[in-house]
């Protein structure tokens, strides 16, 4: 069945392969040629021809469903209809649909996901841009700083005209302009022990781009208590680190790796030591990729 037919409904558990890609993809879907296959289409004609094509490829145990999906539905059998997308969404996310690991089901998961960015700075900027571009449905941003001219070397959600304005509102304007489909929630305050649990509880994933150790430990502790995964990254001069902390999933947390913070002044900040601007883009892109992997369920997270 073709994509538009599949969107209208399908038999739960069925593998979707368009007729035009059948010969190219069948070995990925059914690697063993003695596997029983029941092919179905809308009315039973194309599936009959598809069955003949499969037999020519060595798949001998193939049958065509008489009457196809239409008859199945008319008989009252179970059907499933996924999240319906607008014409604009179908075009915007079309490159995701071509990826077997994402497809329309994966895109629907992205649209339903809620992710919060801790910081709208060097890491939060590129991560936020890619999360918005890929269609993460709800993005929260928590930061209390204002845009400074020195930020513009790396914090790409901000610009000259926004110097002196709220980073959260600047980031919201940029992400909304990139993808109006996304709901951006502003948290224009510093995350601390009085609000961390409350602000994080409504999100699926926490993206940590904090630039100080007290906040990193605070975010970690709240995530552990709430059972939320953290997609974490840090940068220093020309070096970057990225990982996923998912204690609820059986993985370690930030405190497992670093039980105690370094003594004050031992690790200089970007303000004191400097940082390569483009490095933020590299690490932020890794964070966005890890978020997508957690939401959709493809690949192995960097745990």
Where are these regions (language model features)?
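Glycine-rich, N-terminal phosphate-binding loop of Rossmann-like dinucleotide-binding domains
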Residues: 1, 41, 209-211
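Rhodanese-like catalytic fold shared by cysteine-dependent sulfurtransferases
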Residues: 3-105
């Amino acid at each position: 069945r073709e994509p538009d037919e599949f969107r209208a409904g399908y038999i739960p558990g069925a593998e979707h392969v368009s007729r035009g890609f059948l010969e190219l993809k069948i070995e990925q879907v059914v690697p063993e040629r003695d596997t029983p296959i029941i092919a179905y289409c809308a009315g039973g004609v194309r599936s009959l021809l598809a069955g003949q094509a499969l037999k020519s490829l060595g798949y001998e145990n193939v049958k065509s469903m008489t009457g196809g999906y239409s008859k199945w539905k008319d008989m009252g059998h179970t059907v499933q209809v996924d999240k319906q997308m607008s014409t604009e969404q179908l075009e915007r996310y079309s490159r995701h649909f071509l990826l077997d690991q994402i497809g329309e089901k994966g895109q629907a998961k992205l649209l339903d996901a809620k992710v919060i960015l801790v910081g709208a700075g060097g890491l939060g900027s590129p991560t936020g841009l890619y999360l918005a571009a890929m269609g993460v449905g709800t993005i929260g941003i928590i930061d209390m700083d204002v845009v400074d001219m020195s930020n513009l070397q790396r914090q790409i959600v901000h610009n000259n005209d926004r110097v002196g304005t709220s980073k959260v509102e600047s980031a919201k304007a940029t992400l909304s302009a990139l993808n109006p489909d996304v709901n951006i929630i502003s948290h224009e305050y510093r995350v601390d022990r009085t609000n961390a649990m409350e602000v994080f509880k409504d999100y699926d994933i926490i993206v940590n781009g904090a630039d100080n150790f007290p906040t990193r430990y605070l975010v970690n502790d709240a995530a552990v208590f709430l059972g939320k995964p953290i997609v974490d990254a840090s940068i220093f001069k020309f070096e970057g680190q990225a990982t996923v902390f998912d204690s609820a999933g059986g993985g370690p947390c930030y405190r497992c790796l670093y039980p105690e913070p370094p003594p004050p002044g031992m690790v200089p900040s970007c303000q004191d030591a400097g940082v390569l601007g483009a490095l933020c883009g590299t690490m932020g892109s890794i964070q966005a990729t890890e978020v997508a992997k957690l939401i959709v369920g493809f690949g192995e997270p960097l745990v």
